[in-house]
Amino acid sequence: MEAIFCGVGEAFDKHLSNTSILVVDDSQGSRRQVLLDCGFSAPGPFWCHALDPSALDAVWISHFHGDHFLGLPQLMLRLFEEGRRQPLTIVCQTGGGATIKAAMQLAYPGFSEKLTY
């Protein structure tokens, strides 16, 4: 298992992007990738550090502060633009689906209806 730090800063750090960690596990003979948190500054570093961004299996959201989840709309849009079709699992607290849908609608109105994954 490998942990790739895509960011180690806090919400208002002017030098480092939000804390976000890409966990890559090859132990079962197939690669699994999980992104731990996806704050507003996390998508760019994720694309720089991920070996295969389209192979992302899941995103785990620790809690619903902007610096932990507001990068999700950008991440999902980019995956869509690059042709992603397989499902993306999002793990979050109970009731978080409505919060994510609201963020998607605010960031890119109508986009979530176009998602094919």
Q: In which residue ranges do the predicted regions lie?
A:
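Binuclear metal-dependent hydrolase catalytic cores
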Residues: M1-Y117
